[in-house]
Every structure is written in C-alpha cells, then in structure tokens.
Amino acid sequence: MGKIEFKVATIEDAPAIFSLLEKLSQDLDKEKEFSGSVKALEKYGFSEPPAFEAILASQNNKPLGLAVFFYEFSTWRGKSGLYIQDLYVTPKSRGLGLGAGLIKEAIKRGQLKDVVYVNLAVHNSNNDTLGFYENIGFIEINDKKTLLLEGKPFDMLRENN
C-alpha cells in the first residue's frame, strides 16, 4: 500500500472529480438530481477567477476522496471562511482519516485568504456523516434553513429587470 497523498486539483483532475461526485450522488440516492459534467468542472473550476477549488486524496494515483469548496465572507463575523460544497470519501477508504485530512487541507489552502471558519451542509438522510462532522468539532446551527431558487422562479427574477 502506498502513502495517501493530498493535492490541490488541477484541470487534468476534472474527470476524477466528476467520477467522485457521481459516486457521491449514488451514495446519497440522488443520481437523478446530479447533472454535473467534466466540461462544467473544467469551465468553472479552472478559469479565472475559479468558482471553486478542490482537494483530492489519492493512493497510488487512485482517487479516494475529495473536498470541493469555495470562499465566502461573513458580514456578521467580518471574516472570510470556506464553504465545503462536497466532501466525499470512497466507502472502502472510510475510517482512514481522509475526511478530516481533506478538510484540513482545504483549511490550509484557505489560509491564503485568511479564513477563520468552515461552513457546510449535510443531507438529512446522511446521519453517519453528521456524526463524523460533530466528532471533529462542527456544530449544528438550528437558526437557519437552507433555501434554493432555481428553474422558473429564478428565470422570472433574472428576466424581470
């Protein structure tokens, strides 16, 4: 067994990122909702400015996990933070510390932007993962709800200038 390595993803890693995101959608039983593509990852993640960054965990050049994140700013804190959009570790690689390692590497990367916190959301059906996050120090914020605007309502607001 080779050493587990973490690296900042490059455009050449877009197919591996896509493959891991596809597996994540399957694990969450959300394949029908997943409409990402390698092209979209290349376009939005590796252009200037990038819409997201990614950290990959691998062993012997085989991708085992990833963290996809972007920077945000809290007006209430007056500080920058990270929002982890997706964190995924392949089932056979769980329990090896990759999830915490991916978060740690994202935080290291975020030091370039003076981040002081990490924000993320967990699917309601993903109780095992919720326990993982709580074990490493995340706390649940009960005074917020996640809302989404897309499709026709989004188009109506965009078109009504």
Model-derived regions: residue spans:
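Conserved GNAT-fold acetyl-CoA-binding loop/helix
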Residues: F18, E22-Y44
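A short helix-loop-beta-strand connector motif used in the catalytic cores of GNAT acetyltransferases and
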Residues: Y44-L56, Y83
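Conserved acetyl-CoA-binding loop-helix of GNAT-fold acetyltransferases
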Residues: G95-K108, N135
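A short, internal acetyl-CoA/4′-phosphopantetheine-binding micro-motif in the GNAT/acyltransferase core
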Residues: L87-R94
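Conserved beta-strand in the GNAT
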Residues: L56, K62-Y71, Y83
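A short, polar/charged loop-to-alpha-helix boundary motif
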Residues: S74-S80
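A short beta-loop-alpha structural element at the N-terminal edge
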Residues: E5-I17
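C-terminal "cap" of GNAT-fold acetyltransferases
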Residues: V116-N161
